[in-house]
Structures are given as C-alpha cells and as structure tokens.
C-alpha cells in the first residue's frame, strides 16, 4: 500500500470505515485500495439485512464467518468496505444499503456516479 493518504469522494482525506469488525482491503479499518484490489473494496456501507440477504442470494455470502481470512461475518448495522462493482449492482437491483461518503474512497467514482451514491448517503448535511 502507498504511504500516501487516500481521498474520499469529496477529495478530502479518507475517514476510517470500521475497526469492529475490522474492514478494508488491507484490514486497516479504511476503504483504501491499490492495483491488487481487483474487487475495488472502496464503498463504506452500513450493511442491512436486506443487502446481506441479497448479496448471499446472488453469490457473495457476507454473513458466514471465515476466520481463516480474518472475516467475522456481517450483521445488520455493521460498516464494511464493499466492492464498488457489487454495490453498483445492488443499486441497479434495488438492494443497496446506506453508505458513508466521507469514508468511501474516491476510486469508487470510476464505477458509480456521485449522484447515485448521494441517494444512499448517511453523512450528508
């Protein structure tokens, strides 16, 4: 990972997403990314039961723990860095959960327009 502080969708320093459960491509609590992150784990989502059930149904089980990968399994209300491509699909299929834009990496905007993200934002004033 680059030592450089990554930016959020507003061009500001990226804020931490979650330390419990510990999230992020680097398991550093932030939705940081690099060229090796093919899933682009950059959207800080507050997962809902609906989103988790949809995700499991379409092939990405985020509920079942996998301790061998440092994955605790998620429950309603957890914050987690989800894949931008996966979140874009959730929007299109009506299963998107809420997101924290100040905790969402600017890289997300390469895949999801800011206007779509704002519809699900928890942290707009």
Please provide the spans of the model-predicted regions.
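Short, compositionally biased
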Residues: 87-110
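Glycine- and charge-enriched low-complexity intrinsically disordered segments
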Residues: 106-125
């Amino acid at each position: 990972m680059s030592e450089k502080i990554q930016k959020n969708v507003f061009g500001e320093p990226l804020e931490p997403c979650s330390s419990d459960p510990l999230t992020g491509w680097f398991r550093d609590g932030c939705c940081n990314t690099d060229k090796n992150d093919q899933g682009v784990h950059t959207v800080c989502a507050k997962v809902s039961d609906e989103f988790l059930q949809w995700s499991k149904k379409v092939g990405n089980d985020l509920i079942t723990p996998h301790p061998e990968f440092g994955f605790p399994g998620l429950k309603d209300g957890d914050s987690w860095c989800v894949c931008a491509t996966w979140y874009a699909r959730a929007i299109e299929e009506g299963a998107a959960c809420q997101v924290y834009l100040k905790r969402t990496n600017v890289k997300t905007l390469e895949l999801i327009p800011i206007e779509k993200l704002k519809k699900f934002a928890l942290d707009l004033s």
